[in-house]
Structure formats: structure tokens, C-alpha cells
């Protein structure tokens, strides 16, 4: 089983990323789900090809906005979430995941951590590592 770290909405809070530096190094995969994509630039060298990133709404029109990754036969759809209106409902996000044949969805944008299952799809939002967020994060 792979050890996966999921980050989102770091918004320049590099100290939050450094606080889990050892965990990042020990992991098999690291996903950053946007806002601010560039926060992970200085970790690229040590994480190499185990770093997967998508751009968020604060990353100003860059791509990719979403990726589909196969992890030991499990298809993971990773996106920031803003394109799917996730602050209101997860309906469009789940429909996209189904269309891609995904078993799991990783998304951010809401700054609210959650893990749930919808229509047989595991849905994970890690919350925000942003220093001023009052919402819980994993």
C-alpha cells in the first residue's frame, strides 16, 4: 500500500509544509491540489517524480487543472475543485470523476477538510494549510 500525502491551499505558508518535511520524504506520493502551486517548487528536487500538482484558482490560468493518476489499480482524480462549484455542492465533481472512471477524488478550494464516500467514490479534501484558516485540516 502506498503512503500518500495530500496538501491544498497552502497560500504561501511554507512553514506548514516544512513542519511535515519528514513525512513528505517518507511518503510514496505527494499531491498538491493548488493555491499556491509554486509553494512546492523548492521541494521538487527532493520529491522528484513522486510530486503531483494541479493549479488552483489563485494560480492564475495555468495548467494542468486536473490529473488522473493510477495508483496500484486505483484511479485517483485530482483537481483544485473550483471548476466544479465545490463550495456549493460536490455533484459536478462526482459526475466528472464517474466520467473518468475514478475510484477516488482529491480536491481542495473549500478550505474544509473531509473524507467521505459518494456513489462508491472516495472523496478527500485535506483542508487548508493556510495560516489564517479557521477551518479544520488533516
Residue spans for each PLM region:
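Short active-site segment of divalent metal-dependent hydrolases/proteases
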Residues: 12, 38, 83, 112, ...
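Generic detector of short, locally flexible boundary/turn motifs and exposed helical patches
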Residues: 15-19, 32-47, 70-71, 87-91, ...
Amino acid at each position: 500500500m502506498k503512503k500518500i500525502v495530500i496538501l491544498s491551499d497552502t497560500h504561501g505558508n511554507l512553514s506548514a509544509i516544512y513542519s511535515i518535511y519528514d513525512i513528505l520524504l517518507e511518503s510514496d506520493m505527494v499531491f498538491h491540489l493548488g493555491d499556491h502551486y509554486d509553494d512546492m517548487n523548492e521541494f521538487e528536487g527532493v520529491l522528484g517524480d513522486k510530486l503531483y500538482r494541479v493549479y488552483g484558482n489563485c494560480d492564475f490560468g495555468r495548467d494542468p487543472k486536473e490529473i488522473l493518476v493510477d495508483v496500484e489499480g486505483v484511479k485517483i482524480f485530482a483537481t483544485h475543485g473550483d471548476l466544479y462549484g465545490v463550495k456549493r455542492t460536490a455533484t459536478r465533481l462526482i459526475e466528472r470523476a464517474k466520467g473518468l472512471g475514478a475510484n477516488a477524488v482529491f480536491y481542495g478550494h473549500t478550505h474544509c477538510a473531509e473524507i467521505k464516500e459518494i456513489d462508491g467514490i472516495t472523496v478527500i479534501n485535506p483542508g487548508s494549510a493556510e495560516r489564517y484558516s479557521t477551518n479544520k485540516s488533516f
